[in-house]
Amino acid sequence: MENQSLIHREANCLSRFDRLPVKSEMLKIIAVLAAVSVVEAFDLGLIGQTVLVLKQIWNLGPAETGLLATCSTIGVVLGTFSCGFLSDRYGRKRVLFWAVFIFTVFTFMGPLMENFYWVVAMRFLSGLGSGAVFPIPYLYISELVGAKQRGVTFAYCNSILVLSYVLPSSFGAWAVATFPLEVAWKLPFLVGG
């Protein structure tokens, strides 16, 4: 009988939460999460343009080109796996802050490296941060937004993320057309960092 009362109270609490309106504080948090997604998407997408330029400048073979193109994705996978454990242990806000810090610093350091292997290392470490960032906005939305607005909010945030993947390619194409290749490959990293 006592268990039923506890379950009933929890169900009432959840249904009350779902009826709460979206307030300005929630919108601010969602806007920050969307901005983080834009920066993360830029960071992940910048390698597509960069790998073609570095292949030409550094005379990279197929194995090196493949490693450069995938090293950040490998980092993302490992970072995503660690996100849940770290968020439960240290809190989502703290993990989000440090993950953004990690991918920003290592992205910014990428063009400062003049060696292929150091650039690969920077991209891998940046990917670890990006991977830890990726699930957190979805977790926050599922907790902050009531059931009636949750689907629309997910759709908006996902649309922003997907549209943001266009930014690094556009910026990279402009940089390659405007600057010498030795400079052009560095610019997306500096902007993304």
What do these predicted ranges mean?
Residues 1-193:
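Transmembrane-helix signature of 12-pass secondary carriers
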